[in-house]
Amino acid sequence: MAYSPRKRARSQTPHLHTLVPTDAEKPTLQGFAGYKVGMTHALMVDYRPTSTTSGQSIQTPVTVVETPPMKAQGMRCYRRGPQGLEVASEIWPGKEGGGNGEGKERELDPTVEEVRLLAQTSPHLVSGVPSKDPNLMELGVGGGTLVERIEYARSLLGKDVNVRDFTHEGDMVDVCAVTKGKGFQGAV
């Protein structure tokens, strides 16, 4: 009813099919991984102008998400092909490059349209997460020119990426999540 498709998820990592283009002047990450650690409530002033409680103090439920640093493992550049996006070039820091992005690298294709950072989560830093195995995921790099995005992604290779590189305090963010999938048991 509320979720589609109604079946068990393929993996614990959510799959985003579209990245919203950003008009930021400097390159920035377009996503970050976090783990739900609980819920609580917050007292806040209702900011919605058409609400009946607009401007009044209200109590609202909030979800607490812990965001440990992610490790930037690699970088991929995509070009538009007949079947959609295809990998044009990629960088995996290796022993040859000393972990600074000079390792295994293909020639940079001039038809590149999109840059993504391959980042590894750190679930072992969060207590209460049953899996301690890291997940590898692609984070979009948006804003600035294409050359600036490539240089920004290269500068992050082999380093820890914090949530402060993605968003700032007080910003609104969209959240995509994967449920545990308890079947017919419990509330949806």
Task: Please describe what each predicted stretch is.
Residues 1-188:
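Extended basic (Lys/Arg/His-rich) segments that typically form rRNA-contacting surfaces
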